[in-house]
Amino acid sequence: MNDIRVEKLLINYKTLEQFKRFKEYGNQELSMLEDLQNNIIENDSESPFYGIHIGHTLIARMSLYRVRAKYDAYFEPPQDYLELWKLEVLPDYRGRNYGKALVDFAKSFQLPIKTNPRINSHGFWEKMGFQKAKYEMERDLGENPLIWMPAGVREKDV
């Protein structure tokens, strides 16, 4: 598994075509097609998309957004953190550590991470070292975020 390489995905029509394979398998909430289409339309060259290819086939992907410290409502001391969204591995490739490789890549930035897990995915996130954030109604708006914190970071009191 040492040969798994996570790479930033280009914002182009080839990536858009590859994302369509995920929409067939994933839930609407996981669809990154609209996000990618908006980035293409806006000519936004800073891609938040990362993925793993086997040959020329994209088999796992996620969105990773950096949130600036001034908007940090989760961690102490206040700092930049990452929001990890829409992690998905195609069904034929699940159970082979590709999801773990994506999460480990996000952790390699040594910034706290927040994610909103899908139903039935809590076990995966717990294995990855994530914990439930203390719920705060105004901040979390009905979501149940999970967080991961590197050494020296703690959860903000609500």
Question: Residue spans of the language-model regions?
Answer:
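Short amphipathic alpha-helix that is part of the acyltransferase structural core
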Residues: M1-I41, H53
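Conserved acyl-donor/pantetheine-binding loop and adjacent beta-alpha core of acyl/acetyltransferases
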Residues: N27-K86, R94, E138-W148
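Residue-level recognition of the GNAT/N-acetyltransferase active site
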Residues: W85, L90, R118
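Conserved acetyl-CoA-binding loop-helix of GNAT-fold acetyltransferases
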Residues: V89, R94-S108
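Conserved active-site alpha-helix within GNAT-family acetyltransferase domains
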Residues: R118-E143
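Active-site or metal-binding loop neighborhoods of secreted/extracellular toxin and effector enzymes
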Residues: N144-V158
